[in-house]
């Protein structure tokens, strides 16, 4: 029987989507295995160790701990401060999102990098900077006798400092791609400026605002370093309480219960976040972001720009400037020179070695995060992914919300026997850092991959190209910039990871955040000066990496960050 060429092509075209679906499912094997071994297994090991004693389960500890008044108070404060921090961050950052989306002004790329620096700094550095600003003997204390340390206001301000970039990049990135002509058309039909914004722009932005708010709530709900340093013994979040129960009281059963409570809360937050992300990816009329920014016109727009710049200067730049000033307090760059020797006996090596260690660890973590995150993003490319893949997408975000203290301690407990006896291996630190980097890689690459015209892939497959060749010759050229940006962001985040690394970094191989924390934990002006110097170096490295990302990004919106 003769078969026409057209029938062959139709058969190939029908087989291509089925083959693509099988390949996408196959791509999930590596990410699933990675998260199962290096995330689910260590966290489960901590929970099991805490709730299983002498071979018997102590389920009653769940109710004993959860019903305690102290835990209820911690849970209430954790939720309350997260909600207040989220509301305050949105109030302060949404005008900034508009300015970065719609205004063109000199130094915009540099300023965008500057506002992102706090997001990737370790909390111990930020806590130290705010102590120098609002604590005893700080700038505000010297000038006006005002102290905010050990108050909830210091915690809230530091959370806004951290999460300002989340709102600016998530909401501003979409805002820059909305067609301003739609709002202008509404005004031509007689709508006021506010009515046009409320009926046209706000509905389009609502999913992005909701997604940003949920991410800010997640980050502040799991806050650790900021609350521990600025809140003192008065305030405690679930994360701080887990750390206290684990490392100070050695009550693993209480820590396990608190971890489960946090896990349940984070799971609910991420489920809602996944739904808002899908809504955000609905049909919108998007345009090139580079064509929507204009020079401010009129007194109102110039005043708005000035107000945003003033806010950035006071809230974001001033704490960083105080950090630099404290590092230069010793004449002749004395604090920086002291990094070459460990006169205080804090380390087995000079503190300056932490710079090289951090760069090496971050490079390895970036490679792992890009590989795992890239495979995961490719597997999630289809918009009409089934429930299994949608669940997988949500689970990829879990490392951002589950206690880093639990993960780090879980590594030490779970990965201690063959075939995964890694306790003495240097790879533990990059693995822990990569867990935090993978979600950012996915969130940056996924929207770009979904924007690739599926017909290009299908045409290449019909012509006989293998899935690997389709990805190499169709997807890769189109997503190369997003891939580089994802790698850079993973690198910056890995540099600042502290919660898990503090458990895993060996004394002879400290990272910059761990070195800063150890120096701050020792008395003396020399140790404090070295801590400020290392913090400044870390800040400058992160700023340089983010500035390169902004150069790569140009005027285009790339993913969610």
PLM region spans:
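Amphipathic cytosolic juxtamembrane alpha-helices at the membrane-cytosol interface
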Residues: 17-19, 76, 106-110, 153-154, ...
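Short membrane-interfacial helix/loop motifs at transmembrane-helix boundaries
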Residues: 25, 33-72, 79-82, 87, ...
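Membrane-interfacial helix termini and adjacent extracytoplasmic/periplasmic loops
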Residues: 11-17, 59-60, 64, 72, ...
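C-terminal transmembrane helix and the adjacent membrane-cytosol boundary/short C-terminal tail
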Residues: 2-12, 22, 27, 107-108, ...
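Transmembrane-helix boundary motif in ABC transporter permease subunits
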Residues: 84-115, 128, 182, 196-201, ...
């Amino acid at each position: 029987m003769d078969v026409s060429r057209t029938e062959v092509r139709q058969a190939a075209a029908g087989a291509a989507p089925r083959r693509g679906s099988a390949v996408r499912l196959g791509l999930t094997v590596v990410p699933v295995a990675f998260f199962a071994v290096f995330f689910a297994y260590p966290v489960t090991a901590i929970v099991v160790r805490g709730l299983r004693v002498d071979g018997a389960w102590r389920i009653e500890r769940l109710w004993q701990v959860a019903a305690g008044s102290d835990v209820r108070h911690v849970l209430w404060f954790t939720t309350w401060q997260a909600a207040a921090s989220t509301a305050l961050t949105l109030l302060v950052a949404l005008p900034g999102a508009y300015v970065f989306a719609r205004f063109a002004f000199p130094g915009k790329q540099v300023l965008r990098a500057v506002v992102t620096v706090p997001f990737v700094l370790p909390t111990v550095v930020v806590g130290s900077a705010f102590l120098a600003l609002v604590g005893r003997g700080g700038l505000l204390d010297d000038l006006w006798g005002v102290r905010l340390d050990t108050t909830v206001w210091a915690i809230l301000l530091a959370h806004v400092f951290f999460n300002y970039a989340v709102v600016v990049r998530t909401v501003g990135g979409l805002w820059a791609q909305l067609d301003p002509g739609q709002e202008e058309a509404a005004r031509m039909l007689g709508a006021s400026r506010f009515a046009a914004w409320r009926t046209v722009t706000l509905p389009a932005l609502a999913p992005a605002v909701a997604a940003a708010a949920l991410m800010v709530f997640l980050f502040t709900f799991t806050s650790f370093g900021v609350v521990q340093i600025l809140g003192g013994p008065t305030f405690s979040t679930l994360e701080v309480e887990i750390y206290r129960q684990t490392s100070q009281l050695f009550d693993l059963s209480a820590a396990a219960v608190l971890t489960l409570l946090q896990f349940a809360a984070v799971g609910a937050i991420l489920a809602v976040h996944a739904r808002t992300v899908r809504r955000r990816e609905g049909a919108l009329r998007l345009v090139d972001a580079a064509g929507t920014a204009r020079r401010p016109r009129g007194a109102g727009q110039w005043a708005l720009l000035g107000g945003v710049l003033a806010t950035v200067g006071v809230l974001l730049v001033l704490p960083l400037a105080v950090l630099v000033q404290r590092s230069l307090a010793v004449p002749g760059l004395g604090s920086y020179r002291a990094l070459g020797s460990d006169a205080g006996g804090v380390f087995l090596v000079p503190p300056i070695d932490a710079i090289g260690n951090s760069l090496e660890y971050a490079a390895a973590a970036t490679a792992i995060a890009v590989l795992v995150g890239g495979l995961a993003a490719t597997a999630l490319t289809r918009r009409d992914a089934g429930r299994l893949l949608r669940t997988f997408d949500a689970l990829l975000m879990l490392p951002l919300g589950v206690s880093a203290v639990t993960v780090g301690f879980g590594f030490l407990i779970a990965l201690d026997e063959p075939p995964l006896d890694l306790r003495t291996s240097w790879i533990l630190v990059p693995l822990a850092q990569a867990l935090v980097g993978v979600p950012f890689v996915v969130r940056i690459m996924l929207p770009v991959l979904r924007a690739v015209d599926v017909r290009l892939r299908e045409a290449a497959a019909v012509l006989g190209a293998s899935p690997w060749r389709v990805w190499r010759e169709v997807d890769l050229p189109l997503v190369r910039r997003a891939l580089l940006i994802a790698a850079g962001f993973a690198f910056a985040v890995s540099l600042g990871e502290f919660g898990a690394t503090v458990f895993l970094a060996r004394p002879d191989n400290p990272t910059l955040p761990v070195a800063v924390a150890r120096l701050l934990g020792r008395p003396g002006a020399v140790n404090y000066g070295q801590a400020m110097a290392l913090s400044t170096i870390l800040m400058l490295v992160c700023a340089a990496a983010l500035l390169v990302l902004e150069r790569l990004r140009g005027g285009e919106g790339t993913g969610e960050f």
